[in-house]
Amino acid sequence: WSPEQISGWLRRTKPRQKTLRISPETIYKTLYFRSREALHHLNIQHLQRSHSLRHGRRHTRKGERGTINIVNGTPIHERSRNIDNRRSLGHWEGDLVSGTKNSHIATLVDRKSRYTIILRLRGKDSVSVNQALTDKFLSLPSELRKSLTWDRGMELARHLEFTVSTGVKVYFCDPQSPWQRGTNENTNELIRQYFPKKTCLAQYTQHELDLVAAQLNNRPRKTLKFKTPKEIIERGVALTD
């Protein structure tokens, strides 16, 4: 958690306990100045990141994988306003995160709640990715299976099969436009704190990936008024039962 998340969560969950009121600046200064030599550099680096990176429209990832002409792909510009304004659960953004030795994981983030799912992949070919996504979405409640926004990578060439199997509509971003999946891009930056570049992702089990996702889903977010993604999504699903 960042100092801002700690401070905001305490204000929200302990409103009557004034002794627990503490500003982000106080937390940061205490950790940084009193324990600077004891703290590992990586921890300091994470403290400095009080929020995830915001990528501008000209930002592209180094080594961006090639795009293809997706057959019968629906462009992102045809998404409904309800998806764009984050009013309902079940609209996801997704992408692949790559490691060494040709290893990959798939990441999914719900646009409204910021709830994160991380999937182990056998490969980044369209068959492997389609199977992993299909299995996961079919395990979700129907109210969480509405749409998926992805980039134009060849791993989702079988998107029509995925939609037929799950009922989830797929929208494709414009080429070289990662900001159109900004929520997913920012979440991937958080995931990289657990799985740095030059890490072989194949060494991790699905259970280990689930534990990382659970940490992210139990982390309060300023954009959610310091509620957690898990709280938001569980409350939303409960209201539809």
PLM ranges: what are they?
Residues 47-106:
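Mobile-element integrase/transposase regions
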Residues 102-103, 111-116:
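Coil-to-beta-strand transition motifs
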Residues 114-119, 172, 197:
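Short small-residue beta-strand/loop micro-motif enriched in glycine and branched aliphatics
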